[in-house]
Amino acid sequence: MAVQKIIITPILVFLVTIFFNVSSSSSSNNSQYQFLNHGVRSAYWPAGDDFSPSLIDTNYFTHILLAFIQPEPISFKLEITKSGIKWGQNFIKALRHRSPPVKTLLSIGGGGSNSTLFSEIASTKQNREIFINSTIEVARKYRFDGVDLDWEFPETQQDMFNLGLLYEEWYNALFAEAKVRRKPRLLLTSAVYYNSTVRLIGKHGPRSYPTQAINKYLDWASPMCFDYHGTWDNNTDFNAALYDSKSEISTNFGLHSWIKSGVRPEKLVMGLALYGRAWELKDPNVNGVGAEAVGPATDTDGSMNYNEILKFNKQSGANVVYDKVAISFYSYAGTTWIGYDDGPSITTKVRFAKSLGLKGYFFWALGKDKDWSISKQASNAWGH
């Protein structure tokens, strides 16, 4: 998931203190976890996004994750600066009196963050303790309900082993802190690779997640079931196919790999993408899945949010195809080809997740579905 730096300032203390005085009933042990009884319907809000958090319709979500804050490279404590105060205040104000209420988590890391830094943090007990204590301090100070780690990605099997130690010590610290302060324990979650084994090209080869630690210490893990294909490929393909008979790169394979690895289904929250990937076709007359492409069709990396895709399809009169085998959409017009998800594919994926006994799903990211049509269909499919 794309990294954006979160900034927290002391000025927010007053705002969030008011919030939790007004909402003191949410501090009970029962209310902290009542959201988990009927599943998790969550989404990330990218820090500094031009989509105001005041526009978030909480009817469709149980948890909102604020993304992202980074650890400092020397102290290993969470980085807190004086900039970014405006969006920070807006986030707190927007969610403090919402009905229905949502739980908020502070997410650490993100795509493009420093994987080597996380490796160093996780490598020793002292480093882990400094980092963990900082996360608890910040989360409590600004009244979050939990913390989320998005380490993309551990690069060695030793990293994975150390990640398991980090989960264990983090959970134990959260449990002890909650007991001392007589408060509900902060939630602990982690965004992970779509597969239980990371097979990204690298000198260290495949490495598997610490599944026992995930079962024992996380409230849930969130496989990122997207970014399977993109403009780094020379041929068009789906961003987040549910099924792929030609390879292991699919949500079906990934989620089953997690379950086969020993992670209990109720510990998994499936990732969904509110964006697609756009290619420039080499030949506009060759426009199916697997067509040759010459690069991204946009000025960025080919990423287009759901609203932009709908606008493109309408304005260009694009041909829209629902692949009922892959359970994903693509559209094409001229030399532009886009792979993405729409209502029917999202609905099928959510029902698939529920059939596996998963805890829920999450979206990356809020602001890309401004009319809430996809969010609503996902929530309905979950049975809320």
Swiss-Prot record:
InterPro entries: Chitinase_II/V-like_cat, Chitinase_insertion_sf, Glyco_hydro18_cat, Glyco_hydro_18_chit_AS, Glycoside_hydrolase_SF, Glycosyl_Hydrlase_18
Signal peptide: 1-27
Any one annotated GO CC term: extracellular region
Pathway this chain belongs to: Glycan degradation; chitin degradation
Gene (name only): CHIT5A
Active site: 152 (proton donor)
EC number from the UniProt entry: 3.2.1.14
Domain of life: Eukaryota
Protein name per its UniProtKB record: Class V chitinase CHIT5a
Family: Belongs to the glycosyl hydrolase 18 family. Chitinase class V subfamily.
